[in-house]
């Protein structure tokens, strides 16, 4: 049996081009089936405090064009009111799962804040500021990337705010 090198994801190529150091973590999964964030933390042996999930929302001011990305700890929930305030919107709502690929280029369970089709305004929950490294989707189910949060936030021109309950 031949083993081929794992193809790099768009997120990994962008990090490589920017010369950002990162570590990959893989976990077993059934092809195409998303795994919830707490299980991803368990399967990769990572502390859930530093494992983050990527959520995509639309703003009320222009629902067909104003999309916002929020990256939060897997054990927390996004507070939509705080999230809206962080991006200067009256309100935001989660996009439908069916829309994820068309908007981001990624699939549910494999949505990375790095390397989306278009770079949307991205906000990390403020807890990330206390971490040396943060773990987030590498752009496909079964792959996580660990890197310094400051490097990722700078790369994607992101921000931090209190956006969780």
Region annotations inferred by a language model:
Residues 1-165:
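Extended, low-hydrophobicity, polar/charged segments
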């Amino acid at each position: 049996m031949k083993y081929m090198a794992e193809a790099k994801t768009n997120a990994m190529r962008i990090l490589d081009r920017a010369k950002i150091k990162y570590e990959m973590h893989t976990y077993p999964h059934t092809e195409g089936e998303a795994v919830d964030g707490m299980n991803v933390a368990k399967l990769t042996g990572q502390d859930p405090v530093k494992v983050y999930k990527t959520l995509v929302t639309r703003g009320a001011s222009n629902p067909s064009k104003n999309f916002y990305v929020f990256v939060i700890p897997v054990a927390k929930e996004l507070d939509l009111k705080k999230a809206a305030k962080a991006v200067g919107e009256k309100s935001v709502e989660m996009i439908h799962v069916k829309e994820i690929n068309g908007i981001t280029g990624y699939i549910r369970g494999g949505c990375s804040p790095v390397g989306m089709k278009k770079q949307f305004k991205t906000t990390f929950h403020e807890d990330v500021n206390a971490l040396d490294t943060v773990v987030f989707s590498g752009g496909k189910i079964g792959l996580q990337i660990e890197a310094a949060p400051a490097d990722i936030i700078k790369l994607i021109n992101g921000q931090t705010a209190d956006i969780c309950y």
